[in-house]
Design a protein with these regions (language model features):
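Conserved glycine-rich FAD pyrophosphate-binding loop
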Residues: 4-5, 39-41, 45-47, 70, ...
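General beta-strand structural signal in soluble alpha/beta enzymes
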Residues: 25-29, 51-52, 72-76, 83, ...
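Glycine-rich N-terminal segment of FAD-binding domains in flavoprotein oxidoreductases
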Residues: 30-32, 36-104, 118, 138-139
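Structural signature of FAD isoalloxazine-binding scaffolds in flavoprotein oxidoreductases
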Residues: 51, 81-105, 161-184, 259
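Anion-binding (especially nucleotide phosphate/pyrophosphate-binding) glycine-rich loop
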Residues: 89-98, 103-104, 109-151
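FAD-binding subdomain of flavoenzyme oxidoreductases
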Residues: 132-288
């Protein structure tokens, strides 16, 4: 821990309180708990959690932390799945200050909505809502947006998404603070917007919304992953289409994983797809879906909007354990989900202190709540579930609808399986069911925590030319599992594989065996959730982290790297 004395820390905390106000500073462990604990796992100590109310306040808080030689952990929604948003244990050599950016939630629309300027606390949901009247969409829709995830959090972690044509979250235009080799805090404006010269001028102009059209330059730098469409169509390439550590997608704020303090990002938006149609495809032979994917990517003039895979087992788990999530979104809309997600987090944190309540009380209560309602899935989906093991939800738009329908009719004259053209309600519910699958495995583990050891959640990216995408585990691994749950973004070959592990199994040892199998298959991992504190960062990613943070003062330890100042290794 830090060598600073208690008196020094008291003076430091007083300085933070002076900068942001006493009501926006937490230092009592009971009050900071929900910011120190990860979404799925991971936690550690922190000296304080501070909530700046403007970009200029954020700059001043950062300066105070650097002067006091504190570790800085930038945190927005704390929805990361691999522990990258929180402290990891208590073996750091300096005190940790968590800077929560939730109050910094402004959003600036540029031009006619073709681009936006997102701030540290801007959520995907608020961005989606602001763009809808303009007929535009952000990089990602229903998914992370439902749990209040931040736009900049996605950029910093190369987050993926279900939309085939948009690739991972990426930009080359951002405003960020970096601690340089001399330990000095510097502000770098690569937004392509004229904001002034000094940090105070730059940040005040953003805080006061004084950006004019004439300030905005278009200098050829990219504000989304511009060539992803060409990469995903290259079905003969022996590398994945996208994954977190892809060196071609690491650029300043993009992929920095908290090694920079990002103040704003400039992003492209996308024209909302009109006349969408969902085709629900089922088969018992994985090679049928392989042929469909390869043909569509190589030959279709119109790429799908989305192509989501579900195995029958995750279909069943999601039907039972994702039912309340499905019903809440279906009946109340996505705009209520961040509120309920936040409420659940606060309730869990409060009930943890009360011995009377069993662990996962809210999960158990919500599970029983879901049982009160009748079956929620359309009859044709249930029929396809009974007939077929493998399901593909193919969403097309515009001219792609006719193109897909005519080809699928011809293809299934000879191929095993079938498809049906969804009604609007069926299509909406099919994709909502797929979304509910993402949290269903976590709910299963919570409800059955007395009976299962844990959930082992992997997200992997397969090589684009791989034809053996469906996993077959050796008996010695299979015997340690209760359930194997496979779902993912099929056109991108990005899969989420959740394993419910039997009671008494060494989950860490099992994970190492799993990762070894993935390495043998040429897969990359993680694909979307980033390394956090659960995966070792490849050498190229470690090099990127060192370049961004030479003193190792920002989110140290990420990717299983050193937690010590100046990247010193433990002797």
């Amino acid at each position: 821990m830090s060598s600073m004395t208690t008196t020094d820390n008291k003076a430091f905390l007083n300085e933070l309180a002076r900068l942001v106000g006493h009501s926006h500073l937490l230092s009592v462990p009971a009050n900071t708990a929900r910011y120190r604990k990860g979404f799925r796992s991971g936690q550690g100590d922190a000296l304080a959690v501070v909530f700046p109310g403007s970009l200029l306040e954020l700059w001043r808080v950062l300066k105070a932390c650097v002067t006091a030689d504190k570790i800085i952990l930038m945190q927005a929604a704390n929805t990361g799945l691999t522990e990258g948003s929180t402290p990891n244990g208590n073996d750091y050599d300096r005190d940790i200050v968590i800077i929560s950016t939730l109050r910094l939630d402004k959003l600036h629309v540029l031009g006619k909505g073709e681009q936006v300027l997102a701030y540290p606390g801007t959520t995907l949901y608020s961005l989606e809502k602001a763009l809808k009247p303009l007929g535009r969409e952000p990089h990602s829709v229903i998914g992370s947006s439902c749990i209040g995830a931040s736009v900049i959090g996605g950029i910093c972690n190369n987050s993926g998404g279900s939309l085939v044509q948009r690739g991972p979250a990426y930009t080359e235009m951002s405003l960020f603070a970096r601690i340089n080799e001399d330990g000095k805090l510097t502000l770098v404006n690569h937004l392509g917007i004229d904001l002034g010269e000094t940090p105070e001028q730059i940040l005040s102009k953003l805080d006061d919304d004084r950006i004019k059209d004439d300030d905005v330059r278009h200098d050829g730098r990219h504000a989304h992953d511009y060539d992803y469409v060409h990469r995903v169509r290259d079905i003969e390439a022996d590398t994945p289409a996208r994954y977190n550590a892809d060196p071609d997608r690491l650029f300043e704020s993009s992929g920095c994983a908290g090694k920079l303090a990002v103040f704003a990002v400039r992003l492209d938006t996308f024209e909302a797809e009109k006349n969408q149609q969902v085709f629900y495809i089922g088969t018992n032979q994985p090679e049928v879906l392989t042929e469909i994917r390869r043909h569509i990517l190589a030959n279709f003039e119109n790429l799908p909007v989305a192509g989501e895979y579900m195995h029958r087992d995750i279909y069943d788990i999601a039907e039972k354990y994702g039912k309340d999530t499905f019903l809440m979104i279906d009946k109340l809309g996505t705009d209520k989900m961040p509120f309920f997600f936040n409420l659940k987090g606060r309730t869990d944190a409060m009930l943890e202190k009360v011995k009377f309540f069993r662990p996962h009380f809210t999960d158990r209560a919500m599970q029983k709540f879901g049982h009160l309602f009748p079956s929620h899935l359309p009859p044709r989906m249930k029929n396809w579930r009974d007939k077929y093991e493998h399901h593909l939800l193919l969403k097309m738009a515009g001219d792609g609808v006719g193109e897909a329908k005519s080809w699928l009719v011809d293809y299934f004259k000879q191929a095993e399986g079938d498809f049906f053209v969804c009604t609007p309600e069926e299509g909406s519910k099919a994709f909502l069911h797929r979304f509910a699958a993402a949290g269903a495995a976590i709910r299963y583990q919570a409800v059955h925590s007395d009976e299962v050891e844990d959930i082992l959640a992997l997200d992997i990216a397969l090589r684009r030319n791989d034809t053996e995408w469906y996993e077959h585990l050796p008996p010695e691994i299979d015997s340690q599992l209760v359930h194997k749950l496979y779902y993912g973004h099929f056109m991108c070959y990005v899969f989420h594989q959740d394993y419910i592990v039997k009671k008494g199994v060494d989950v860490h040892a099992l994970k190492e065996q799993m990762l070894e199998l993935l390495q043998q298959r040429g897969a990359q991992y993680p694909a979307e959730h980033n390394v956090g504190h659960l995966y070792k960062a490849p050498e190229t990613l470690q090099k990127f982290y060192r370049e961004n943070d030479p003193t190792n003062s920002m989110n140290p330890g990420i990717g299983k790297t050193s937690k010590r100042k100046n990247w010193q290794e433990v002797e």
